[in-house]
Amino acid sequence: MATFKEMLKASMKSKDTEEWLDVYFTRPIGLVFTLLWKRLGVHPTVITILGMILGAAAGWMFWHSELEYNIWGVVLMMLSNFCDSTDGQLARLTGKKTLVGRVLDGFSADVTFFCVYFALSMRMMTELIPGTDVTWGPWIWVMAFMAGIMSHSPQCLLSDYYRQIHLFFLKGKEGSELDKSEEQWRIFREQPKKALFFRAFYYNYAKYCATQERRTKNFQLMMAEATNRYGAPLNLPAARSEERRVGKECV
């Protein structure tokens, strides 16, 4: 029977793509929940949806200025974060990894942070700008747009892509989720006209992949050159592949 430490390692994508806090705090606690959900036969997608609900509830708590509401908001946000950790760990331990689950996981995070940004903006509209006697008013929405849409969202998109690049060279195609937009567009076009859900799903995922590729032009050139020279990126000589894995010249 595997030890807790062995199961923790198996439940991670790779230790060097995990943040320090996740390795020593979030993931171990998440694994405890994972083992509970596994015993109860809960599917990872259910955990993802639960995390989204908890995140939205946290946003509602942050709408209020009272301390007790804010404390509950922090607690709910932490539980949402544990769910965000647990769904992936459960999927890797049980082999229930799906593209729908991956996309839903990202959507869950988007819903959570939208609710938090929206709630804090609504709350701060009537609060004073620090050091002045002027309220934030509609200007807080400008701040939220710059922080959430122009900064936070692109950062999440690229951090996910860089993580998948690293896993691609570390574990190969099977150990990563580095998808090409060209392939996703092909799958989208193959969906029946009446399959509205799947057409919408693959359309949005193809756009997501295309945005990642558009923002990493040097990496796309490197992948094309590796394919032309060696037949496939994973055929890179070991020394060059290691350089890519640790991040040299790849983006």
Model regions and ranges:
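C-terminal membrane-associated helical module and adjoining short loops/tails
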Residues: M1-I29, S151, Y161-K248
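Topogenic membrane-insertion module of multi-pass membrane proteins
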Residues: M1-W72, M78, F82
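Hydrophobic, membrane-inserted alpha-helices
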Residues: F33, I53-G59, C115-A119, R245-K248
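Alpha-helical transmembrane segments of multipass membrane proteins
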Residues: G55-A58, F113, S151, Q155-C156
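Helix-coil boundary and interhelical linker segments in multi-pass alpha-helical membrane proteins
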Residues: G59-W72, F118-A144
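Acidic (Asp/Glu-rich) catalytic motifs at the cytosolic membrane interface
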Residues: E68-S121, M125, S159-L167
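Alpha-helical transmembrane segments of multi-pass membrane proteins
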Residues: M77-C83, F145-C156
